[in-house]
């Protein structure tokens, strides 16, 4: 029995990467009875039949999983936003951060296209960078050519996804990370049958000692399962202060003696972050129930 990681799922086959090789595997029939559906990113136990084929015997417990794109065991999410074209939006950034925080995945902010920004725009981005770093987020600021070595070092030994709205430079970042790995990935590319006209599915691509999920279309924000009471846990700077609130169930909105609101008034929490928290909180409260 071998252990490996699913790096692609297509037409009932699961491509498992183990010890430098890729095996085309099927899942055992009892998976359906147990209501288990293997995902890209799953760590699995499998048995080989020959040099290229095998059967998945078991799926290890998951650290986390996204629904769209369907990927499991993600260590970090690289959230790409552009400084300009389109302009950087803290509202959009905070919404992406909430979507990732609620899945217990470490978010990393990457601000692209700095070479196209004016001096005043660069100064404003620097202010935002300081604010997000003070919260505890890692922030990369890149030009047209991303600092791929720094990002590759960051990804090393991890499984990452890249997300962001269209036009912000996700493809540029992904291609720059993958450009010098042609020889390393030749075997995997051949095994997966990648080509110019191959239909794009979620798959993990080796980047140094880590993997990056090539997730076409990962630009939407979903929080159907997020409850108003748990939103504050997606804002680390608020979670750190909630013990100072007078009321145990304080949601930092209309309650008196709120430590979070006091921190906002003292400029210890960015006003725009609190504003976005309240906006999202109201959206969650006003959300129509699903049956």
Curated annotation (Swiss-Prot):
GO biological process: ribosomal small subunit biogenesis
Official protein name in the record: Small ribosomal subunit biogenesis GTPase RsgA 1
InterPro entries: G_CP_dom, NA-bd_OB-fold, P-loop_NTPase, Ribosome_biogen_GTPase_RsgA, RsgA_GTPase_dom, RsgA_N
Residues that bind GTP: 112-115, 164-172
Sorted UniProt keywords: Cytoplasm, GTP-binding, Hydrolase, Metal-binding, Nucleotide-binding, Ribosome biogenesis, RNA-binding, rRNA-binding, Zinc
GO molecular function: GTP binding; GTPase activity; metal ion binding; rRNA binding
SUPFAM superfamilies given in the database record: Nucleic acid-binding proteins, P-loop containing nucleoside triphosphate hydrolases
E.C. number(s) listed in UniProt: 3.6.1.-
Highest taxon of the lineage: Bacteria
Domain named CP-type G: residues: 63-221
HAMAP family tied to this protein: GTPase_RsgA
Localization annotation: Cytoplasm
Primary subcellular site in the record, as a coarse category: cytoplasm
Record note on cofactor: Binds 1 zinc ion per subunit.
Enzyme class per UniProt: hydrolase
Gene Ontology cellular-component terms listed: cytoplasm
Residues reported in the UniProt entry to bind Zn(2+): 245, 250, 252, 258
Provenance organism: Listeria monocytogenes serotype 4b (strain F2365)
Family: Belongs to the TRAFAC class YlqF/YawG GTPase family. RsgA subfamily.
Cofactor: Zn(2+)
PROSITE patterns per the UniProt record, alphabetical: ENGC_GTPASE, G_CP
Name of the coding gene: rsgA1
Functional description taken from the UniProt entry: One of several proteins that assist in the late maturation steps of the functional core of the 30S ribosomal subunit. Helps release RbfA from mature subunits. May play a role in the assembly of ribosomal proteins into the subunit. Circularly permuted GTPase that catalyzes slow GTP hydrolysis, GTPase activity is stimulated by the 30S ribosomal subunit.
Quaternary structure and partners: Monomer. Associates with 30S ribosomal subunit, binds 16S rRNA.
